[in-house]
Design a protein with these regions (language model features):
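Alpha-helical phosphate/pyrophosphate-handling elements in metalloenzyme active cores
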Residues: 2, 55-65
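Transmembrane helix interruption/hinge and helix-loop junction motifs
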Residues: 63-72, 114-116
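Transit-peptide-like, low-complexity N-terminal presequences
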Residues: 1-8
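Structural signature of hydrophobic alpha-helical transmembrane segments
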Residues: 10-20, 67-74
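Interhelical loop and helix-boundary elements at the membrane-water interface
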Residues: 8, 18-59, 77, 81-112, ...
């Protein structure tokens, strides 16, 4: 089953939507508790794996909805989780974290462009 939206025929529009969606999901929808407790050793109310999986899954859902390609949503979930785990483990700066996430969005746009 192929899902399509009006904006996916224009790669720049899709990239803009993915970046806007990223900001929505990564900041206001994440919440302070999840931002802290998704890191190993900082979990208090729930095991960090659940927090990280839930956060990555919201990103995956957003990518699947905006691209119309569920497999890209799964890829986003996995890669986003790995990037955030790396940030927790190695403590790299927010700008590095965000640059990695935005790079993924560019890759997803390239994939959609090739697929269409």
């Amino acid at each position: 089953m192929q899902y399509t939206f009006a904006h996916v025929d224009q790669p720049l529009n899709l990239l803009i939507m993915l970046v806007l969606g990223h900001f929505l999901v990564d900041f206001p929808l994440q919440g302070d508790k999840m931002a802290v407790e998704k890191c190993p050793g900082k979990d208090v109310t729930l095991n960090w794996r659940w927090w990280l999986t839930a956060h990555a899954a919201t990103h995956g859902f957003m990518v699947a909805v905006l691209t119309g390609v569920p497999f890209l949503g799964l890829a986003e979930m996995l890669v986003h989780g790995l990037i955030d785990f790396g940030k927790c483990r190695f403590g790299y700066k927010l700008i590095v974290d965000q640059a990695l996430h935005w790079s993924c969005k560019m890759i997803w746009v390239a994939c959609v462009t090739v697929m269409h």
